[in-house]
């Protein structure tokens, strides 16, 4: 009698990022080489609660996905999976319903591709017995337990290209250009892009700033004969003693325009603000993100083959390893204010707005 074909599931959850489709492709191709069947679950964890919210994925389904942005499985960062507030098992509990769905589908493993929120949900499912394996995704690069998340490199490329373009127009008109980039709680995109693009000021959540110090930098450049300035600000940056700014309930944003308005008042210069927004999430992944996503997808299937659950694949040095989901969800990977990158930037004269 032939043995039953092994089956694994894969879903994408949270905000989209370049490289999601590359992970899905690697999962399908790696599982296919083992003779396994892959079930693609639509709309993140919400797909575990619906009917007919999944489909079998074959090698034919993932042809041409490497350079393609977005996710063929769709994703959401809203829905039923908030923090579990009780250990009681209820049929109405979405987590209990999800675990039951995983069992009914006969999944040997469920590969969850997402950031900190996604892996936190995966951890709760694992506590209820689900065989989950996480894959780290976020353009913010703020997920703990891994040296790098996929999506970050592409977002960095987009932000750096924007700075390069803003340099020419800023210099032509002697303007101050403020570029707001993503980074809710961490400043990795702003810091890396600011360094790579030659910014004059970098404002990040980890280092509260004073607008007066930023204005001083603009005046200093004017005095040195450089009548334009480039300022990169993460969306979660905040003035000293202040708080994060929101453009709508639950949606960070607005700090770039606030910085621009204050600088016009303090310096009298022509200031223009550019909010990069979702351009950082869309489009084709960079070669590095394609490679990292592929390695993560293949490693997740290998973990399933070895029966390793409740863990997340991660980059450590040059190798892909697995780390406990609890470690990935325990804290955020933040920029250290005295890290080598920050010290390098300061040595180049880049201002973070905190200097006396």
Swiss-Prot record:
GO cellular component: 6-phosphofructokinase complex
Residues bound to ATP: 15, 78-79, 115-118
EC number(s) given by UniProt: 2.7.1.11
Subcellular compartments: Cytoplasm
Names of the cofactor(s): Mg(2+)
Active site: 140
Enzyme category, top tier: transferase
Site (Important for substrate specificity): 117
UniProt pathway annotation: Carbohydrate degradation; glycolysis; D-glyceraldehyde 3-phosphate and glycerone phosphate from D-glucose: step 3/4
Keywords linked to the UniProt accession: ATP-binding, Cytoplasm, Glycolysis, Kinase, Magnesium, Metal-binding, Nucleotide-binding, Transferase
Main location per the UniProt record: cytoplasm
Residues that coordinate or bind substrate: 138-140, 175, 182-184, 235, 272, 278-281
Family label: Belongs to the phosphofructokinase type A (PFKA) family. Mixed-substrate PFK group III subfamily.
Subunit structure of this chain's protein: Homodimer or homotetramer.
Name of protein: ATP-dependent 6-phosphofructokinase
Annotated gene: pfkA
């Amino acid at each position: 009698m032939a043995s039953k074909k092994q089956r694994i599931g894969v879903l994408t959850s949270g905000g989209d990022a370049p490289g999601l489709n590359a992970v899905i492709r690697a999962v399908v191709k790696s599982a296919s080489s083992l003779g396994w069947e892959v079930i693609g679950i639509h709309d993140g964890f919400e797909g575990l609660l619906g009917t007919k919210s999944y489909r079998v994925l074959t090698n034919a389904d993932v042809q041409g996905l490497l350079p393609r942005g977005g996710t063929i499985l769709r994703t959401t960062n809203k829905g039923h999976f908030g923090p579990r507030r009780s250990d009681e098992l209820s049929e109405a509990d979405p987590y209990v319903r999800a675990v039951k769905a995983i069992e009914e589908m006969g999944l040997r493993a469920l590969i969850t591709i997402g950031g900190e929120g996604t892996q936190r949900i995966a951890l709760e499912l694992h506590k209820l017995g689900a065989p989950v394996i996480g894959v780290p995704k976020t353009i913010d690069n703020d997920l703990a337990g891994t040296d790098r998340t996929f999506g970050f490199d592409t977002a960095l490329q987009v932000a750096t290209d924007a700075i390069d373009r803003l340099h020419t127009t800023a210099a032509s008109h002697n303007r101050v250009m403020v570029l707001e980039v993503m980074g809710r709680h961490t400043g990795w995109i702003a810091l890396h892009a600011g360094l790579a693009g030659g910014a004059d000021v970098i404002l990040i959540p980890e280092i509260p700033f004073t607008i007066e110090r930023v204005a001083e930098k603009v005046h200093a450049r004017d005095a040195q004969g450089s009548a334009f300035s480039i300022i990169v600000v993460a969306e979660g940056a905040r003035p000293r003693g202040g708080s994060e700014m929101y453009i709508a309930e639950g949606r960070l944003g607005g700090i770039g325009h606030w910085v621009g308005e204050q600088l016009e008042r303090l310096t009298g210069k022509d200031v223009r603000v550019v909010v990069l927004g979702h351009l950082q999430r869309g489009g084709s992944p960079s070669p590095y993100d394609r490679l990292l996503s592929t390695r993560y997808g293949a490693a997740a299937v290998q973990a399933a083959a070895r029966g390793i659950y409740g863990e997340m694949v991660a980059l450590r040095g040059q190798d892909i390893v697995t780390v406990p989901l609890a470690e990935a969800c325990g804290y955020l990977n933040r920029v250290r204010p005295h890290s080598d990158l920050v010290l390098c930037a300061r040595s180049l004269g880049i201002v973070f707005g905190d200097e006396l």
